């Protein structure tokens, strides 16, 4: 899908072009960008209490740095727990980059956000990241009482590669039977390594193009052959979507991930999963974060806020080792 300037929402054009000029699809630039984004590690959010722990990954002798965000005013009752997985093409980024969003979520409905600094593909390809992220979910469930979290309201959320990890983590949770997830928000998720859809092929949109995507997947999958890629690496390869948690997601119609997101939504619905979905016209990848002040950016962020609040109000999944009620 070739993307021309006039196809892009006027409010998004300049920022998208500028971002695209800076964020180049090369391994050298990914490594440079990773060093830059890593400087945010340890930064706090002014309106929130921020704590940091190191927890064990699924992999032996590996610890994961996790950031824990909560309201400065501690609620008297337990609150939902949110595992938030940041984006960055599986190659870069830190949990600190989403501070304003954590503040928004906690302001909407009191909750505890646990965000892991999962291992990046530049250092450790699949399954490092998903093992770190699933371990974070399991740790949140096992330590819910200490953290003041309701273990029957665990939500998994992420953007882009973080959305892909969210989808993978909920698959693992269903298959392993160790944690029950009440709701997931895998936003414009990176879930299909094959680059075979109409929206992915030849996509030259700003921010994240086919070239970025192929590089991101090559780094993440390491030496895996095409016929060896498992569903926990690329959740679009799953064939059984039954018994996954209720879901909300959105994607822009110029995003390489458009078609894989739509197919994911259709597969979930066909399996009887409740899904809320929005397709935003004339929007490239990550437009909601690049131009949150635009009309369409406000609409996308309002959709997420609405779906998150509704989930907290109505979605529950009691753990298998806990009594109901």
Give each language-model segment a name.
Residues 1-71, 313-325:
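A glycine/proline-hinged amphipathic helix-loop "lid/cap" segment
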Residues 78-87:
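Short beta-strand element of the alpha/beta-hydrolase
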Residues 96-115:
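Short amphipathic alpha-helix adjacent to the substrate-entry channel of hydrolases
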Residues 124-146, 304:
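Alpha/beta-hydrolase active-site loop
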Residues 141-156, 176:
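Gly/Ser-rich "nucleophile elbow"/oxyanion-hole loop immediately N-terminal to the catalytic nucleophile
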Residues 171-227:
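Hydrolase active-site cap/lid region
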Residues 249-251:
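Short beta-strand/loop motif that positions the catalytic acidic residue
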Residues 294-325:
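Catalytic active-site module of serine/aspartate enzymes centered on a nucleophile-bearing elbow/loop
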């Amino acid at each position: 899908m070739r993307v021309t300037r006039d196809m892009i929402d006027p409010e998004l054009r300049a920022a998208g072009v500028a971002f695209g000029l800076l964020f180049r699809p090369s391994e050298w630039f990914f490594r440079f960008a990773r060093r830059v984004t890593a400087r945010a590690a340890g930064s706090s959010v002014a309106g929130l209490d921020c704590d940091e722990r190191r927890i064990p990954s699924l992999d032996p002798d590996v610890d994961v740095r996790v950031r824990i965000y909560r309201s400065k005013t501690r609620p008297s009752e337990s609150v939902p727990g949110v595992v938030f997985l940041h984006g960055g093409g599986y190659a870069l980024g830190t949990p600190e980059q989403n501070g304003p969003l954590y503040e928004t979520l906690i302001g909407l409905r009191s909750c505890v956000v646990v965000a892991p600094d999962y291992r990046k593909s530049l250092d450790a390809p699949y399954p490092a990241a998903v093992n770190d992220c699933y371990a974070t979910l399991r740790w949140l469930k096992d330590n819910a009482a200490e953290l003041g979290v309701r273990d029957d309201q665990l939500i998994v959320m992420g953007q882009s590669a973080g959305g892909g990890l969210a989808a993978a983590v909920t698959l693992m949770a269903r298959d392993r039977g160790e944690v029950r997830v009440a709701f997931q928000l895998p936003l414009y998720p990176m879930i299909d390594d094959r680059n075979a859809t109409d929206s992915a092929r030849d996509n030259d949109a700003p921010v994240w193009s086919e070239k970025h995507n192929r590089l991101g997947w090559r780094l993440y999958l390491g030496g895996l052959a095409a016929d060896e890629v498992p569903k926990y690496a690329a959740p679009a390869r799953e064939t059984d979507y039954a018994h996954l948690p209720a879901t909300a997601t959105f994607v822009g119609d110029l995003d390489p991930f458009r078609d894989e997101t739509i197919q994911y939504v259709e597969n979930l619905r066909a399996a009887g999963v409740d899904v809320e979905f929005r397709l935003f016209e004339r929007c490239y990848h990550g437009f909601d974060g690049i131009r949150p002040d635009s009309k369409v950016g406000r609409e996308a962020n309002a959709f997420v806020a609405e779906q998150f609040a509704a989930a907290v109000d109505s979605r529950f999944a009691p753990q298998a080792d806990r009594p109901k009620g």
